[in-house]
Regions:
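Class I S-adenosyl-L-methionine-dependent methyltransferase module
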Residues: 107-108, 271-298
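Core catalytic lobe of class I
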Residues: 1-271, 298
Length: 298
């Protein structure tokens, strides 16, 4: 059973991804998955109990949610295929005891492995420390802390791209011509991606008016583009269980892939469908050959 019909380019389920993956989606139906999970206690997207972002206890509620999540993800991923999880470490506030960091990266790795996925690698995505200091107002990055007491100073928080692989043999090799050149791979094989443009997001690219719903912390399009080209073939299904406004689908469709997503928040779901429709129109327009064009008028 397939996620999408033969002529269907994309679809987004409106609802909680966890029961949808565990009970409703066909098993082994996803060719590649890339997403940014909600960050517990850091960003709250909805008031719903199903929203992982509303979990206050990293070792309690968030861990339970994510353990079921990874079980569902392992169920729908095809054998031998990859999933990349975009995370960052989460600042621990005074109400949690000492100021420091929650190891969100490690939590995702442990729960992914426990669900049966094979942890293979993670890339680091460089962040601008000055921009992060201004945006987060973190004393640990600011000059005030540097010049008063350096005991608690730390560097900025990078992003991590955690790569898992479903156990088993991959039946269809990912070997499409022209997707990734040798020169690109020389750059992308670096352990730290320092050339990702932080502002190249769907918020900036497509949110043209106040009526357009913007995501709180969207994943950069450069990251998605690289991963989609690396780990999927044209025509295959890319899955994002936390679709947001559709960043992963937007890039996937423009790269000739198909997309399936889940989104809990109504406003994000509606905006995602708009963005995906535009991406598909753009891809179709760019795919037209000279022979498809209307004949010139003499």
């Amino acid at each position: 059973m397939n996620l999408l019909s033969d002529d269907q380019k994309y679809a987004v389920h409106h609802g909680d991804c966890i029961p949808h993956m565990l009970e409703e989606m066909p098993p082994a139906s996803v060719d590649f998955s890339v997403f940014s999970p909600p960050f517990p206690s850091l960003f709250s997207y909805t008031s719903k109990a199903e929203d992982i972002g509303n979990s206050e206890n990293m070792k309690g509620e968030a861990k339970i949610h994510l353990s079921y999540f990874f079980r569902g993800l392992a169920r729908v991923l095809k054998p031998g295929r990859a999933v990349v999880v975009h995370v960052m470490q989460i600042p621990r506030l005074k109400r949690s005891g000492e100021v420091g960091l929650h190891d969100y990266r490690g939590l995702n790795i442990r729960l992914g492995e426990r669900a049966g996925l094979v942890y293979e690698y993670d890339w680091v995505v460089r962040k601008n420390p000055q921009a992060q200091a201004i945006r987060t107002r973190s004393r640990e990055l600011q000059f005030a802390g540097l010049e008063s007491d350096r005991a608690k100073q730390r560097g900025c928080l990078p992003d991590y791209l955690i790569k898992f692989r479903a156990p088993g043999e991959n039946e269809v090799a990912i070997d499409s011509d022209g997707d990734v050149s040798r020169n690109e791979w020389i750059d992308w094989a670096e352990c730290c991606w320092s050339d990702i443009r932080e502002t190249n997001t769907l918020n900036v690219k497509e949110a043209r008016s106040e009526e357009d719903t913007k995501h709180i912390c969207p994943l950069q399009l450069d990251v998605i583009d690289r991963l989609v080209r690396l780990y999927s073939n044209p025509g295959e299904v890319v899955f994002s269980p936390f679709t947001g406004i559709g960043s992963e689908g937007y890039v996937s469709l423009q790269q000739g892939r198909r997309f399936y997503g889940c989104e809990l928040k109504p406003e994000y779901h509606a905006q995602a469908l708009k963005n995906l429709a535009k991406a598909e129109r753009t891809h179709q327009a760019n795919s037209r050959t000279l022979f498809d064009a209307p004949e010139a008028v003499a």
